[in-house]
Amino acid sequence: MNILIVGGAGRLTYEAVLFAASLRHSDPAFGGRLIVADPAPGPLWPKPPGIADAGARALLEEFGAEVMPFEAVHFGASYPHGNKVEALAVLPEGEPFVFFDTDTIVTGALSEVPFHSARPSASMKREATWPKIELYGPGYGAIWRALHDRLGLDFASSLDLSQPDEHWERYLYFNAAWFHGPCPRLFHERMIKAMLMIRDDPPAELVCQEIYPWLDQIALPLVIHGLGGGRPGPDLEGLDGDVTCHWRVLPLAYARESDRAIAVLEAAASPNRVKRVLKEYDPMKRMIYQGRGRKVRTLFDRENLPRKEQAIRNAIRREGFWMR
């Protein structure tokens, strides 16, 4: 299995190092390839977008990662989320892959997860972020049907019939924090086609919808369904579970992630060679190494967290601990 994450200047550099460190810490038997796609300079970037820290690059390579440049053809700085799609072009054609957002750590034996490459899937750790239903506008069903129809996909077979009509979970929708498939080139081509359609020539049902920053997550279920995939089965429960943790932002991670996830994060970051690199990124220096993360952790009861993420963010900001 080939693992793909996206590097880049600044924060992404150090998140990539932490991902690689956690993979080697938690799954030393992993024998696949870890590919860090690094955006190359080009007309869609106003300043150099790639990894600039030579020490970080050397440490990634020491961990066995392959840093490979890719070109931004369609998105670049105007939509950085599109990097995860454009980066698929660096992977070898016809070989199964799994993509992870760079703000993820590996907390268990990823090499033992039984990915079924012929049935692509993605993260279900999502909320009702898109579409936003207007009072007099089309509902969930009409919007998602229009998108499926535009790409010639069977809409009915994508539905979760255990959920009521017009409830958002009835309709196939993923978090693009991880996804896997059988062929990155095919996945790349279909994602680009779907994203450009949604951006440049959307169905009329989308006229009131804001597509940013969710463009990748709107296209993802269409591509996965079109390739014969769907919602992940129990074999993949370890992703967003005991095997990987999408921590997103360090203050949020310390506020709400499990004791085990935080212990792995800190253990992976503890070797001196890792510490020397990660301390170059101020939020990691302060949160992980200077104890600010542990102070954030004391503010919250993991068994009784606020329902809305914004409430967690606000509580952290009130204490002066928010950093990214």
Predicted feature residues:
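Extended catalytic-interface subdomain
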Residues: 131-182
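A structural signal for short, well-ordered beta-strand segments and their strand-loop junctions
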Residues: 35-37, 98-101, 106, 122-123, ...
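A glycosyltransferase accessory/donor-loop signature
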Residues: 5-8, 160-177, 181-324
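Conserved glycosyltransferase catalytic-site signature
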Residues: 13-17, 81-85, 176, 213-218
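N-terminal anchoring/stem segment of glycosyltransferases
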Residues: 1-74, 93, 211, 291-324
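A conserved donor-nucleotide-binding helix/loop in the catalytic core
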Residues: 69-100, 105-108, 112, 120-125
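Conserved donor-nucleotide/metal-binding helix-loop-beta segment in metal-dependent transferases, i.e.
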Residues: 106-146
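Short, surface-exposed amphipathic charged segments that create phosphate/polyanion-binding patches used
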Residues: 80-87, 137-139, 249-253
